[in-house]
Amino acid sequence: MKLAYWMYAGPAHIGVLRVSSSFKNVHAIMHAPLGDDYFNVMRSMLERERDFTPVTASIVDRHVLARGSQEKVVENITRKNKEETPDLILLTPTCTSSILQEDLHNFVESALAKPVQIDEHADHKVTQQSALSSVSPLLPLEENTLIVSELDKKLSPSSKLHINMPNICIPEGEGEGEQTKNSIFVKSATLTNLSEEELLNQEHHTKTRNHSDVILADVNHYRVNELQAADRTLEQIVRYYISQAQKQNCLNITKTAKPSVNIIGIFTLGFHNQHDCRELKRLFNDLGIQINEIIPEGGNVHNLKKLPQAWFNFVPYREIGLMTAMYLKSEFNMPYVAITPMGLIDTAACIRSICKIITTQLLNQTATVQEPSKFIYPKATSLEQTNILETSQKETILKDNPDSGNTLSTTVEEIETLFNKYIDQQTRFVSQAAWFSRSIDCQNLTGKKAVVFGDATHSAAMTKLLAREMGIKVSCAGTYCKHDADWFREQVSGFCDQVLITDDHTQVGDMIAQLEPAAIFGTQMERHVGKRLDIPCGVISAPVHIQNFPLGYRPFLGYEGTNQIADLVYNSFNLGMEDHLLQIFGGHDSENNSSIATHLNTNNAINLAPGYLPEGEGSSRTSNVVSTISSEKKAIVWSPEGLAELNKVPGFVRGKVKRNTEKYALQKNCSMITVEVMYAAKEALSA
């Protein structure tokens, strides 16, 4: 634990709540003091959904500290089970409430042992006589109103609209036509036809019923952050329900007839996760692969037992889902793909990895003589269709003609050829990023410096994309996922000048200020740093604010995601002389662009204070790194000729030229910056 002004990854309980609120009909109870219960507000603000966040805070106050927490926690679990009837209730403490060192496992067991009281004030038994005397108000009946019997109720229009209409009791000896049409009260038929024993059984079923599943999040809140806790919680839930199905002997591990996949790791508050999920669905549909399950977003916990039926698992983000995929791999020998399809090269590598898994699965199915397998490409891919030979056909061929042992290998080669054709078609004719990277507009970005920072998945993928596909020099690539530092270094090795592994945003800001890149690609915090330093920033990773939860379709994965990234990269850089031309001809933002020049022209000679910073750079630790003047405790004087020459520099690079000249003057111990010093600084920098 540490006290921080701002954090990239939040505390562990935030990750637990993100996973629980992603599932359908799962409720989370957070055992926490006031101040830790901000998740509801945060999710309601960022995720533009209609449903309420299914999280309840069991507040730890002075009364709880005096009496103990068990009574309140058990009461909240029982109450939510009665009100919400969820499939699963997930209990989690926070790092603050964990200090109490309470036995929450015992709380869960106590809640499971306690029956659910539906009506705590019902102390009398419902008898048949009381049921017969129950009446319900009803509007006057028209002559053409149908008398609906219990048998026909399912077919009535009112039942289709889920209207709870009581049936009308017709006295013995009277027909339907003799029913009084102006009845104001009729007897309710809900309990009329039940015997006394059935009434008692119904009363017992109403007052007590089985509990929802209750799980205590198995997370060390002192040692893991938000992302690690989310990964662990998802694996815990999957393991719980698969183990439950194994104990009940209802776990079906038979593979689906056609290739299928589980997408693991799409969850709430993720960076463009909803859009990425749609793009992945389209990608797998083009490849002829069915979606078996998507977890946790929109998933049902009772469907988790179907996970082993898929041919393989796909983990788009390393931050969540990798532990679940590894568990399914160890338990059921299910292969998984963890290559993020971000950029043309990585997307092609991901598809080839999927192709390898599918062909391997087909070989295994043929060896074990399972059900006949077929693999058909849809027409949407514009590729020729192919059918895998059925197992019985292969056996007949091999028996009748021993020399035809290459039939299966030929079929596998055909599948690989089709996958390669799909990659080629998407890269050359569908995706716009390939030809754009060879256009003159993108070539103008070649050699420009950029800094990339974010989570391990997006930062590594973005670094490789910029270096390999767009020719941009990545001066520094970094991540705040310190637990995945080794993998990150391996991925970005050879694609950047230096690597930064830290979760301290001030270090990232200092590094950006020292490198002075042409653009930044990072999180919401890097956007703030870019605004202070007047450096454009493109957001490519969580944590982000509401503007990066767009309503429109903006994926970052797949071929459409590559188009979006190309637009983001190009629009993040300053477009050449645009700012300078706007300043010359009086554009809409010429006032801002000429701010430095206006300030310099107000005085013929300016004695800059030690803490002076150009406009747009606030008094922060990051901004202080921009100029070494403050650290050297020296004052620099600009001559009138030097100021006039500096004013001739285009506005969009004037601040950078000014800082470089001042650094050179400090190194050479020049007390006044003249025109000669400026040109000497330029030559030294060019060399």
Curated annotation (Swiss-Prot):
<dbReference type="InterPro" id="IPR005969">
    <property type="entry name" value="Protochl_reductB"/>
</dbReference>
<dbReference type="GO" id="GO:0019685">
    <property type="term" value="P:photosynthesis, dark reaction"/>
</dbReference>
<comment type="function">
    <text>Component of the dark-operative protochlorophyllide reductase (DPOR) that uses Mg-ATP and reduced ferredoxin to reduce ring D of protochlorophyllide (Pchlide) to form chlorophyllide a (Chlide). This reaction is light-independent. The NB-protein (ChlN-ChlB) is the catalytic component of the complex.</text>
</comment>
<feature type="binding site">
    <location>
        <position position="36"/>
    </location>
    <ligand>
        <name>[4Fe-4S] cluster</name>
    </ligand>
</feature>
<keyword id="KW-0067">ATP-binding</keyword>
<comment type="subunit">
    <text>Protochlorophyllide reductase is composed of three subunits; ChlL, ChlN and ChlB. Forms a heterotetramer of two ChlB and two ChlN subunits.</text>
</comment>
<dbReference type="GO" id="GO:0046872">
    <property type="term" value="F:metal ion binding"/>
</dbReference>
<keyword id="KW-0934">Plastid</keyword>
<keyword id="KW-0150">Chloroplast</keyword>
<dbReference type="GO" id="GO:0005524">
    <property type="term" value="F:ATP binding"/>
</dbReference>
<comment type="similarity">
    <text>Belongs to the ChlB/BchB/BchZ family.</text>
</comment>
<feature type="active site" description="Proton donor">
    <location>
        <position position="441"/>
    </location>
</feature>
<dbReference type="Pfam" id="PF00148">
    <property type="entry name" value="Oxidored_nitro"/>
</dbReference>
<keyword id="KW-0560">Oxidoreductase</keyword>
<dbReference type="GO" id="GO:0036068">
    <property type="term" value="P:light-independent chlorophyll biosynthetic process"/>
</dbReference>
<keyword id="KW-0479">Metal-binding</keyword>
<dbReference type="GO" id="GO:0009507">
    <property type="term" value="C:chloroplast"/>
</dbReference>
<keyword id="KW-0149">Chlorophyll biosynthesis</keyword>
<dbReference type="InterPro" id="IPR000510">
    <property type="entry name" value="Nase/OxRdtase_comp1"/>
</dbReference>
<keyword id="KW-0408">Iron</keyword>
<dbReference type="GO" id="GO:0016636">
    <property type="term" value="F:oxidoreductase activity, acting on the CH-CH group of donors, iron-sulfur protein as acceptor"/>
</dbReference>
<dbReference type="InterPro" id="IPR050152">
    <property type="entry name" value="ChlB/BchB/BchZ"/>
</dbReference>
<comment type="pathway">
    <text>Porphyrin-containing compound metabolism; chlorophyll biosynthesis (light-independent).</text>
</comment>
<keyword id="KW-0004">4Fe-4S</keyword>
<dbReference type="InterPro" id="IPR042298">
    <property type="entry name" value="P-CP_red_C"/>
</dbReference>
<dbReference type="GO" id="GO:0016730">
    <property type="term" value="F:oxidoreductase activity, acting on iron-sulfur proteins as donors"/>
</dbReference>
<feature type="binding site">
    <location>
        <begin position="576"/>
        <end position="577"/>
    </location>
    <ligand>
        <name>substrate</name>
    </ligand>
</feature>
<keyword id="KW-0547">Nucleotide-binding</keyword>
<dbReference type="Pfam" id="PF08369">
    <property type="entry name" value="PCP_red"/>
</dbReference>
<dbReference type="InterPro" id="IPR013580">
    <property type="entry name" value="LI-POR_suB-like_C"/>
</dbReference>
<dbReference type="GO" id="GO:0051539">
    <property type="term" value="F:4 iron, 4 sulfur cluster binding"/>
</dbReference>
<keyword id="KW-0602">Photosynthesis</keyword>
<protein>
    <recommendedName>
        <fullName>Light-independent protochlorophyllide reductase subunit B</fullName>
        <ecNumber>1.3.7.7</ecNumber>
    </recommendedName>
</protein>
<keyword id="KW-0411">Iron-sulfur</keyword>
